[in-house]
């Protein structure tokens, strides 16, 4: 007895393109709750840069994870370049370990606070920015000044730069999850407003 297998048709929901997002940069402040002798750090760790006449902080670059830390006498650090929270924490631990290894005493545990996450995203559809600007609250679109629509989202509290190609830049997130939440939320809003179409 012959059996025929008919190919299953994909539902419209399965065929619908899904938005994607990538974390590009995490900026965080770190507090060591103690003062640091930057001259001693410069003498101990040869790879750092310290030129107090030009800038009051010491520049410490890591290759893996690829981050840059600005270290100040106050024991505060600004860390940039991490592509994930995990990389950020790993970088801070590595810096503190290296300082200790070179005889710099660190007494407490570093307190890390994310200040800003910058991400890129692609809705994988084209956006009618004119329509979106008219119907999307907290938005500004002035194409003669800037080609993208600026949307300030209340929850999560982020700013999205949306381009007609469906590409976006997201700033202001404090947690990685907020980036993905914002991308999905704006996609659903634009879809509901009929401001998206296949490219």
Swiss-Prot record:
Disulfide bonds: none annotated. InterPro entries: TBP, TBP_archaea, TBP_CS, TBP_dom_sf. PROSITE patterns: TFIID. GO terms for molecular function: DNA binding; DNA-binding transcription factor activity. One of its GO terms (biological process) is DNA-templated transcription initiation. The keyword Glycosyltransferase does not apply. The keyword Lipid biosynthesis does not apply. CDD domains: TBP_archaea. It comes from the Archaea. Sequence repeats lie at residues 23-99, 114-190. Belongs to the TBP family. This is TATA-box-binding protein.
